[in-house]
Amino acid sequence: MITEIMKQVEIFTDGSCLGNPGPGGYGIVMRYKGTEKTFSGGFNQTTNNRMEMLAAVVALRNLKEPCIVVLTTDSQYVRQGITQWIHGWKKRGWKKADKKPVVNADLWKQLDAEAERHTVDWRWVKGHAGHRENEMCDDLARTAAENPTQDDTGYPG
C-alpha cells in the first residue's frame, strides 16, 4: 500500500452491556478531515467484550477503501487481543495456549480480516476519564444497549 495517498482516519470505539451478559450496544465516532460521523447498534443478549470488538469491526468495515487508521478504544481486551494474542491463536488454529477454544473467535476473525485491509495504530484510553470521544462512544453504546434491535447471532447464550 502506498501510505502517502491513503486517507487518514481517526476512530474511537466503545461497547456497553447492561448485565454482562445482557442487552448490549456499541458506539463509534469516526473523524476524517475534521468531519465526525457516529454509528451505534444495540443487541438483545450479548457481552461487553463482544460489543467492544463489534464496535471496532463495524468501524473498520465502514471504511470504503484502505486507510491509515488511529483506532482508540478503552478496551485492553481488544487492543491486546488484536496486537498480541491473535498471532498465537491463529498458529494454534484458534485455540488458546491451554488448548481451549478462543472466546469470541467469530469476532476475532472478523476483526483480523477488517484490520488487514488498513494500516491500524491501536491505541488505548482510560474509560470514564473525561476523554471527549470516548465519552461520546460510551453514550452511544449505552443508549443502543437500552434500545436493542438486533440479535447477536454469535453469542452462544
Curated annotation (Swiss-Prot):
The gene is rnhA. One of its GO terms (biological process) is DNA replication, removal of RNA primer. Residues 5-146 form the RNase H type-1 domain. HAMAP family: RNase_H. The keyword Plastid does not apply. This is Ribonuclease H. Mg(2+) 2 binds at residues 14, 138. The keyword Cell cycle does not apply. Monomer. It comes from Aliivibrio salmonicida (strain LFI1238). It catalyses: Endonucleolytic cleavage to 5'-phosphomonoester. Keywords: Cytoplasm, Endonuclease, Hydrolase, Magnesium, Metal-binding, Nuclease. PROSITE patterns: RNASE_H_1 (PS50879). Its EC number is 3.1.26.4. Mg(2+) 1 binds at residues 14, 52, 74. Pfam families: RNase_H. One of its GO terms (cellular component) is cytoplasm. Binds 1 Mg(2+) ion per subunit. May bind a second metal ion at a regulatory site, or after substrate binding. Its cofactor is Mg(2+). GO terms for molecular function: magnesium ion binding; nucleic acid binding; RNA-DNA hybrid ribonuclease activity. Belongs to the RNase H family. It is found in: Cytoplasm. Endonuclease that specifically degrades the RNA of RNA-DNA hybrids.
